[in-house]
């Protein structure tokens, strides 16, 4: 461990400071496709009984009308966060009739792209903007890739913890600047070490053969309808996913918040010729994309982790970051575990907390030389062949065996897990470390290996396996309904969201959509750091 990490742990471990670690916030967003009992994409509209996707803060849609997104509140205890996620699932199942929630990250067999419905958010200007943005995503990347689902894990330290750490360190800026500086340092370490999460929690080693739409690939045939890689952990996070020439040169610098926001601001304001050639409207005058820039909006940039700040109404993410600094990080590289009803377990959450906290507290030099490309290469190697015996990664420009480096990282994370246990009066973080060490020692214990083992044991391809797991989870949720009070609470939220959308559409100022989009685009150009 570095001297800095030791000093920070000692400070946080003092009796008067330990309670700060109980105030970390945890939020989870889980995406999942709605499918028919025959494992086909459900092309029905977003169920009105779930509320309005535009205004319901717990149940919305992601890219497609068929792609649900469940969002928990940010809570101090991950037990409560996961309980909230479980209840949202149970509410959803009470309104889905015979449809199922698809259990893995990689999608079910998909129809032709023209039959994949884009999420619809009503007739308000902001609703139409969200719809046109998704039309642009389809134009730029295709609809198929947008149907991949994942888990996003939001984590923050309390501001008082950052203020405490700042007191003992030589930092020239104010408390807000130090907090942003520290979150960006966290992200640099996450870039260095996130390959470990893919080994431990990657759960997408196989996919439906039709997903590739005839594109060339290096996958192997598992059966007539399934492609896979024998040692893969997460094909979802491999180069089968986002492949964008426009974004190829967009590598936001994580040296500081200013350079990060500047790079994204440039991307949302810089035309990209292939998009310029397409234009923003089709021959019928219909919008096809919000603009012809490298990115339509900043969220189009695909990354494994994002610095975030809760936005005010009408505020863009970059505006919030520039105005008030980084508030939390959003971990975006987690696969859905198809063996778990909600896709994530408490044991996994405990480890992620310790891992992210390690990234926050450990020394984090700026990414220099080949370190940035090595981080990307390590990540790609692990998602495609992380379980390959003897796999080497690059650490400090020298080869190191994955198992050795992973074990070394767990040893460094252990004191943080111990401190979290001490703060919360539990031993679950240390137990989670032991579970992960067992996966490092025995690759068959990883979710990716277990997916392939289950497929082989049942003589199933990807779709049959996924449908079976989806049915198992549906049975669990349908036989564990919410209490009457809980059900009424969710129904009230859904009803309120429908009323809010209707009010928005009825009372919105008379601004035509073209003007609204122009103002939205101009808002990014007026920001100054």
UniProtKB/Swiss-Prot annotation:
Pathway(s) the chain acts in: Sulfur metabolism; glutathione biosynthesis; glutathione from L-cysteine and L-glutamate: step 1/2
EC numbers for this chain: 6.3.2.2
Gene Ontology molecular function: ATP binding; glutamate-cysteine ligase activity; metal ion binding
Gene3D superfamilies per record: 3.30.590.20
Domain of life: Bacteria
Pfam families: Glu_cys_ligase
GO cellular component: cytosol
A GO biological-process term: glutathione biosynthetic process
Key words, A-Z: ATP-binding, Glutathione biosynthesis, Ligase, Nucleotide-binding
Catalytic activity, as annotated: L-cysteine + L-glutamate + ATP = gamma-L-glutamyl-L-cysteine + ADP + phosphate + H(+)
Class of the enzyme per the UniProt entry, highest EC level: ligase
Family: Belongs to the glutamate--cysteine ligase type 1 family. Type 1 subfamily.
The protein, known as: Glutamate--cysteine ligase
């Amino acid at each position: 461990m570095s001297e800095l990490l030791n000093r920070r742990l000692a400070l946080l471990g003092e009796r008067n400071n330990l309670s700060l670690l109980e105030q970390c916030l945890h939020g989870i967003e889980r995406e999942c496709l709605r499918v028919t009992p025959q494992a086909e994409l459900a092309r029905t509209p977003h169920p009105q009984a779930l509320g309005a996707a535009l205004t319901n803060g717990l149940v919305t849609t992601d890219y497609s009308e068929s792609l649900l997104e469940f969002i928990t509140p940010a809570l101090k205890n991950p037990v409560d966060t996961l309980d909230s996620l479980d209840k949202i699932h149970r509410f959803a199942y009470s309104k889905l009739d015979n449809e199922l929630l698809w259990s893995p990250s990689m999608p079910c067999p998909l129809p032709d792209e023209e039959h994949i419905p884009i999420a619809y958010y009503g007739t308000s200007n902001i609703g139409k903007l969200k719809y046109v943005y998704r039309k642009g995503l389809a134009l730029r990347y295709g609809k198929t890739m947008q149907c991949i689902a994942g888990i996003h894990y939001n984590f923050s330290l309390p501001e008082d913890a950052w203020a405490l750490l700042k007191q003992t360190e030589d930092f020239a800026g104010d408390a807000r600047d130090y907090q942003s500086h520290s979150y960006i340092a966290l992200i640099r370490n996450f870039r260095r070490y996130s390959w470990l999460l893919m080994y431990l929690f990657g759960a997408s080693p196989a996919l439906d053969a039709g997903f590739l739409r005839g594109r060339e690939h290096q996958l192997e045939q598992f059966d007539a309808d399934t492609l896979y890689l024998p040692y893969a952990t997460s094909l979802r996070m491999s180069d089968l996913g986002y492949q964008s020439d426009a974004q190829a040169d967009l590598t936001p610098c994580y040296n500081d918040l200013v350079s990060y926001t500047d790079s994204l601001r440039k991307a949302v304001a810089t035309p990209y010729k292939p998009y310029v050639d397409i234009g923003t409207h089709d021959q019928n005058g219909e919008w096809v994309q919000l603009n012809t820039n490298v990115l339509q909006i900043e969220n189009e940039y695909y990354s494994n982790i994002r610095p975030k700040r809760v936005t005010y109404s009408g505020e863009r993410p970059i505006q919030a970051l520039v105005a008030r600094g980084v508030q939390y990080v959003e971990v975006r590289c987690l696969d859905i575990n198809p063996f778990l009803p909600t896709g994530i377990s408490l044991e996994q959450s405990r480890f992620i907390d310790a891992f992210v906290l390690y990234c926050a507290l450990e020394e984090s030099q700026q990414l220099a030389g080949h370190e940035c490309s090595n981080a990307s290469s390590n990540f790609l190697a692990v998602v495609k062949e992380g379980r390959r015996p003897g796999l080497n990664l690059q650490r400090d420009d020298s080869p190191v065996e994955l198992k050795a480096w992973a074990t070394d990282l767990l040893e460094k994370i252990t004191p943080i897990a111990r401190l979290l246990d001490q703060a919360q009066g539990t031993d679950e973080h240390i137990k989670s470390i032991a579970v992960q060490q067992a996966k490092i020692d025995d690759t068959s214990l990883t979710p990716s290996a277990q997916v392939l083992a289950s497929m082989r044991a049942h003589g199933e391809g990807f779709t049959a396996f996924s449908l079976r797991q989806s049915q198992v989870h549906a049975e669990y949720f349908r036989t564990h309904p919410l209490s009457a009070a809980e059900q009424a609470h969710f129904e009230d939220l859904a009803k309120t969201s429908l009323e809010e959308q209707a009010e928005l559409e009825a009372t919105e100022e008379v601004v035509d959509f073209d003007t609204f989009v122009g103002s939205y685009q101009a808002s990014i150009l007026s920001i100054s750091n």
